[in-house]
Amino acid sequence: MYKAPKMRFAPRRIAEIPFRGTIAAGVFNTLVSGRIAYPFRITEVKMIFTDDANNWIRHGWYVGRNRSQPTTGPPTGVNIFGRESPVADFVGKAIIRVVPCNIEYPEGGMIIHFYTQNSGPYAYERNASCTIEAM
């Protein structure tokens, strides 16, 4: 009788970091996560564009080591999707945009920045999340 070896699977540490808040008309704004002390990989980002986004809302995802929240443009740090595409921001209307990815940050101490530019005439309620997995 053959007995298969026991397989051991380490539990995966997965977290979904929410980003939510109102942004006034005609401004830039950045929301930041807490410091992520361990090595991680970003596995998915999700952005909800409502009907009133009307392609006026532009989102971008950045990582860096400081908690800067500039009000005149994108945050300092590296655009997460900048190495994958020359156009690394997301624009939409009436869509839930889910972007699966596998972007690793082997050093700890990073902070995720969710950047929004509202070019429209109205305030906008933004809603997004970033899913990370410990490495």
Would you name each region that the model predicts?
Residues 1-135:
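Beta-strand-centric surfaces of beta-sandwich/beta-rich domains
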